[in-house]
Amino acid sequence: MKRTAFFISDGTGITAETLGQSLLAQFENISFTKLTRPYIDTAEKARGMVQQINAAAERDGARPIIFDTVVNQEIRDILAKSNGFMIDIFSTFLAPLEHELISHSSYSVGKSHSISHNAHYMERIEAVNFALDNDDGARTHYYDKADLILVGVSRSGKTPTCLYMAMQYGIRAANYPLTEEDMERLQLPTALKPYREKLFGLTIDSERLAAIRHERKPNSRYSSFSQCEFEVRETEKLLRREKIPFINSTHFSVEEISAKILVEKGVERRLK
């Protein structure tokens, strides 16, 4: 079964997309075509959206699912006339919350992501810059400022995990790729030894690693199964020897990997 899902907002669309994606992920037997439509902030744009929604309904033979965080009532009324199934995220959750808190919400465009109202904005930017500056072992002299240092073989998911933790939680995460020399010595690189308490390992199934590396450097020693198998085996051996916690990233999303790391290491999120 295939359905179309729209994430519509008169702002960035981040809230609609994030919550909508989380809900759709619970329906693994359905394939969704996901379309994000930010800044639908005029009646003309809304009418254009209705045409897109109706076209998708006709194409799929089923109503598209619409997750919206549109504040403007006129625009919402126009969207409601489409052949889609609308889930108004703000009204769904704000009404019962207003009742519980005995207070009216400041229901305005971009409220959850505006720079002027977000005291953590600079924290997030600094964390992202830290992740980029300390990616792939490029710099090690700032490790004293890191909240976490991810270690593992090349292409095991260290960089996207560091960037996700920076964006989502404001965590300053560096990453360091273990080399064959490190594996053969079966001991931590000198640059990492002072920061043992900050280390967390990422490993991955050899088959998956070979497939990922093949996309980057096909038919090379780097992407061969035997090389990947060797690196994964020796890396896990090193991590166990040094008593560094690690997880296999193969079957987890970056969100799940990040959450597991923070729980295991007891690192507090800077953005709450």
From Swiss-Prot:
GO MF annotations in UniProt: ADP binding; ATP binding; phosphotransferase activity, phosphate group as acceptor; protein serine/threonine kinase activity
Keywords linked to the UniProt accession: Kinase, Nucleotide-binding, Serine/threonine-protein kinase, Transferase
Residues annotated as binding ADP: 152-159
InterPro entries attached to this UniProt entry: Kinase-pyrophosphorylase (IPR005177), PSRP (IPR026530)
Pfam annotation, one family: Kinase-PPPase
E.C. number(s) listed in UniProt: 2.7.11.33, 2.7.4.28
Tree of life domain: Bacteria
Enzyme class, first EC level, given as a word: transferase
Function, in words: Bifunctional serine/threonine kinase and phosphorylase involved in the regulation of the phosphoenolpyruvate synthase (PEPS) by catalyzing its phosphorylation/dephosphorylation.
Similarity comment text for this entry: Belongs to the pyruvate, phosphate/water dikinase regulatory protein family. PSRP subfamily.
NCBIfam families: PRK05339.1
The name this protein goes by in its record: Putative phosphoenolpyruvate synthase regulatory protein
Lineage, top ranks: Bacteria, Pseudomonadati, Pseudomonadota, Gammaproteobacteria, Pseudomonadales
